[in-house]
């Protein structure tokens, strides 16, 4: 008889069936999964449904899926109830190497299952977690350990170890420094410093200090202070004005004009000095970079000079007196009388120009003409002014310009004929 086939476990058969179904779906719907057409997507869904659920209707498949979800939720609820009734087994507690076990609260004591009592190496103080202090960046923990590690707690081996470390050759070669470790600073600046941070420069054996000196300010704190210290331009000006004090020279028109003239003269003198210095450097051959204008200013004879390869054109330097201007341009000279400096009143009131009276008089004349044109009455003073003006015009012309009027131009008969013509006239559009 042939040997019997070994029965496979149920879990493995389910996984194999699931893989077979996925393989069939991939073969039958090859290239259709990512198609955008509605027909292709409908066909893809139908094939996957048939392979997974057989000839079941979609409603039945949805019901089975919902039933499975409900079963999973029921199992979770049962586990929670069992955990509440019977406390679960707590995993063995682990701590990092070198850490003090008394600084960690016992996990079994939290669940009320610790039976060791005082012999337990972990702490049974639940408030210990809230008492943990923040690690200070201004204190090196190694210094505190050295202060607490006194000779009263040493034995012979510890004493020999300390002597060898303190007076050994390796310790003598090792330089003593107060420089702060760069890895320590980088960790603080980048917010990476914490309880589990280890110095990449050697850990606890790092020769540099892992503590900030007193008064040290980090870069991120400096930026915050700079932002807070920024003030507006107006506040800065007022602050500087207040710092001057009362014993200062008051700015008036006279002192301002004197200051302006002095500054202008200083500017002119400085320009002349620079020109003389550059001219001397040019003559001495020290000037390496000069402009073409400066060359002709320093040596005017170069204007009439001619090179060997130049053409026969001769350039003349005009004086400006005999030159003829074909297109005359109207030039208005600047009247300096218009720019007379005036002191401003301290109360802030602006000084009006004297021309306002002439403009006001011209406005009054225009108003009088407007009232005459509209048929308004004229005052006696205005009438006298008009008569005087008319008399002046007559005297200037010598002869009074008058237009003769024909009184018999339009008689009654002419007006009657005009009305008849208007009545009998046919108007065309």
From Swiss-Prot:
User: Which UniProt keywords are present, listed alphabetically?
Assistant: Coiled coil, Cytoplasm, Metal-binding, Nucleus, Repeat, Zinc, Zinc-finger
Main localization, broad class: cytoplasm
Q: Spans of biased composition, class Basic and acidic residues?
A: 14-28, 65-75
Under Gene Ontology molecular function, one entry of this record is: zinc ion binding
Compositional bias annotation for Polar residues: 1-11
Pfam families with a match to the protein in the record: DFRP_C, zf-CCCH
Listed GO CC annotations: cytosol; nucleus
Show the segment(s) annotated as Required for interaction with DRG1: 237-261
Q: Which GO terms describe its biological process?
A: cytoplasmic translation
Region listing for Disordered, in residue ranges? 1-28, 56-75, 301-327, 362-415
Establish whether keyword Secreted is in the entry: no
Where is this protein localized, as stated in its record?
Cytoplasm; Nucleus
Q: Which InterPro entries match?
A: ZC3H15/TMA46_C, Znf_CCCH, Znf_CCCH_sf
Residue stretches of biased makeup (Acidic residues): 384-396
Q: Where are the zinc fingers (C3H1-type)?
A: 100-127, 175-213
Q: Which residues form a coiled coil?
A: 59-87, 219-285
Give the family this protein belongs to, as stated in its UniProt record: Belongs to the ZC3H15/TMA46 family.
Assembly with partners or alone? Interacts with DRG1.
Q: Which PANTHER family match?
A: ZINC FINGER CCCH DOMAIN-CONTAINING PROTEIN 15 (PTHR12681:SF0), ZINC FINGER-CONTAINING PROTEIN P48ZNF (PTHR12681)
The record describes the protein's role as:
Protects DRG1 from proteolytic degradation.
Q: What is the recorded name of this protein? A: Zinc finger CCCH domain-containing protein 15
Which species is this record about?
Answer: Gallus gallus (Chicken)
This protein's gene is called: ZC3H15
């Amino acid at each position: 008889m042939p040997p019997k086939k070994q029965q496979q476990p149920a879990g493995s058969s389910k996984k194999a069936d699931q893989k077979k179904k996925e393989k069939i779906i991939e073969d039958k719907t090859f290239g259709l999964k990512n198609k955008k057409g509605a027909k292709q997507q409908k066909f893809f869904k139908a094939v996957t449904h048939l392979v997974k659920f057989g000839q079941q209707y979609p409603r039945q498949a949805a019901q089975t899926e919902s039933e499975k979800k409900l079963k999973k939720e029921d199992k979770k609820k049962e586990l929670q109830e069992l955990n509440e009734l019977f406390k679960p087994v707590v995993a063995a507690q682990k701590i990092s190497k070198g850490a003090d076990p008394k600084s960690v609260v016992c996990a079994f004591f939290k669940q009320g299952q610790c039976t060791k009592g005082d012999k337990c190496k972990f702490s049974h103080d639940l408030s210990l977690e809230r008492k943990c202090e923040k690690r200070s960046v201004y204190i090196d923990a190694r210094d505190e350990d050295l202060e607490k590690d006194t000779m009263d707690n040493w034995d012979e081996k510890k004493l020999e170890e300390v002597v060898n470390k303190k007076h050994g050759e390796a310790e003598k070669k090792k330089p003593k420094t107060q420089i702060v470790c760069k890895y320590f600073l980088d960790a603080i600046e980048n917010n990476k410093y914490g309880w589990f941070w280890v110095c990449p420069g050697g850990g606890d054996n790092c020769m540099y200090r892992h503590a900030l000196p007193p008064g040290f300010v980090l870069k991120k704190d400096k930026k915050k202070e700079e932002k807070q210290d920024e003030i507006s331009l107006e506040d800065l000006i007022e602050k500087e004005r207040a710092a001057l004090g009362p014993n200062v020279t008051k700015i008036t028109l006279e002192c301002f004009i004197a200051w302006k003239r002095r500054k202008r003269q200083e500017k002119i003198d400085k320009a002349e000095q620079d020109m003389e210095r550059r001219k001397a450097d040019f003559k001495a051959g020290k000037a390496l970079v000069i402009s073409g204008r400066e060359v002709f200013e320093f040596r005017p004879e170069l204007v009439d000079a001619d090179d060997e390869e130049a053409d026969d054109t001769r350039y003349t330097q005009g004086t400006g007196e005999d030159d003829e201007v074909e297109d005359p341009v109207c030039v208005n000279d600047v009247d300096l009388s218009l720019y007379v400096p005036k002191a401003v009143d301290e109360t802030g009131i602006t000084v009006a120009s004297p021309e306002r009276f002439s403009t006001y008089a011209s406005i009054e004349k225009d108003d009088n003409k407007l009232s005459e044109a509209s048929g308004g009455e004229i005052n006696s003073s205005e009438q006298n002014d008009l008569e005087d003006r008319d008399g002046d015009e007559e005297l200037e012309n010598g002869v009074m310009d008058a237009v003769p009027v024909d009184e018999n131009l339009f008689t009654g008969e002419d007006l009657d004929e005009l009305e008849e013509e208007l009545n009998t006239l046919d108007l065309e559009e």
